[in-house]
């Protein structure tokens, strides 16, 4: 009975967290980008030989990035231009179609390179180069520099 109560409490808290995240797109995208960055750091450390190649960690990174690509277009509704540690350029809302196309290109690069990345360190290096170009393309146009 106690276990059921604990599990029910956890379920409710997770649902509340999800609802809060959905109602605050700025916070949601900030958290998403922080998660992306954490995964990127692990992958880069592998590429530099600072930690051993680990296919499970690479898969986790690519899964995170694939999820990000799916969520990105919906995380920039009108009215979410300000708030939080918002580095989103106003150009996103002025050129939303282009922004969404860049998010789709990121998703395609992640999908196209995922198997290669998980297979070997050499594949990871090639995959990250391809995926990184799509990250840079969007960040160069649509991310403000740190204040």
Language model regions located:
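N-terminal targeting/docking segments
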Residues: 1-2, 19, 86
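Bacterial N-terminal signal peptides that target proteins for export
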Residues: 1-10
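Processing junctions and N-termini across compartments
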Residues: 15, 129-132
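Sec/Tat signal peptide C-region and signal peptidase I cleavage site
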Residues: 15-21
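Extracytoplasmic c-type cytochrome modules immediately beyond a signal peptide or single-pass transmembrane anchor
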Residues: 22-130, 147
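The canonical Cys-X-X-Cys-His
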Residues: 131-142
